[in-house]
Amino acid sequence: MSDSPERVYPMLLDFVRKETISKNLLRVTLTGEDLIGFPEDQNGSHIKVFFPNQASGILQLPVREGDNVIWPEHKPVPRAYSVRQYRAAVNELDIDFVTHGEETPGGGWALKADIGSQIGLIGPAGPDPLIEPADWHIIAGDLSAVPAISAILEKLPSDAKGYVFIEVDEIEDIHDLVHPEEMAINWLMRNPHDAEPALAKAIKQLPSPEKATSLSAFIAGENQSVINCRKILRNDYQIARDKLYAIPYWKRGKTEEAYHDERHDVMDAVY
């Protein structure tokens, strides 16, 4: 995997419109002069979004001075998201937000966003491609991973084979995805009483791929679920480390700020 080209300065972007994808998934379209030149081939890549300061409601973006980042008086709230799609012809960027409620920095901003609303953005970054070429693929994640999963499926060759597992809390979040015919899409309902996350359980029960000489996988979502899935894929499926990209987006019971350092420890772990 190579790294995506990174635009390191904060861009200021303007709200254009929004679209409901499912009950708890909301697409926001953005534009702005700073967005011109954004790479077209980075759908699914990581971006960092800056939301208005929660106390003042004011959006002020950090600036770089040499190797230093200078934060403003009204420090914005940073959150990690994925590029859903960029359309250079109209200079529009789509970001899909999981809407947990109006009190959250990201989902709350998306729910209330209207003409005049703005955010800051840095990116794209991360591995390219998000899933390595192989005879057979395993893709798994929760609702927070759907934007990246959707982008991956749209980029895969038409003859790609494998399984996709997506865990949701509510049946109303199940929706159609564009995908290669032989990538089997499986929606799973989360059971909070299960000791083992649904994604890990589903991957354990997969039949062995026939005539597959290479495997690759993409796993994203809640911390413990990602860890469990990664262990199974490394230990049971013997997927090579360079063919497996596993990224925890969040951890149940922890804020983004409290989880930040732990996330990087999980990503750096070797299995």
From Swiss-Prot:
GO terms for cellular component: cytoplasm. GO terms for biological process: vibriobactin metabolic process. It is found in: Cytoplasm. It catalyses: 2 a Fe(II)-siderophore + NAD(+) + H(+) = 2 a Fe(III)-siderophore + NADH. Monomer. Pfam families: FAD_binding_9, SIP. Ferric-siderophore reductase involved in iron removal from the siderophores after their transport into the cell. Acts as a major ferric-vulnibactin reductase catalyzing the reduction of Fe(3+)-vulnibactin, a catecholate siderophore synthesized by V.vulnificus. The keyword Oxidoreductase applies. This is Ferric vulnibactin reductase VuuB. Its cofactor is FAD. Its EC number is 1.16.1.7. The keyword Oxidoreductase applies. Residues 8-131 form the FAD-binding FR-type domain. InterPro entries: FAD-bd_9_SIP, FAD-bd_FR_type, FNR_nucleotide-bd, Riboflavin_synthase-like_b-brl, SIP_C, SIP_fam.
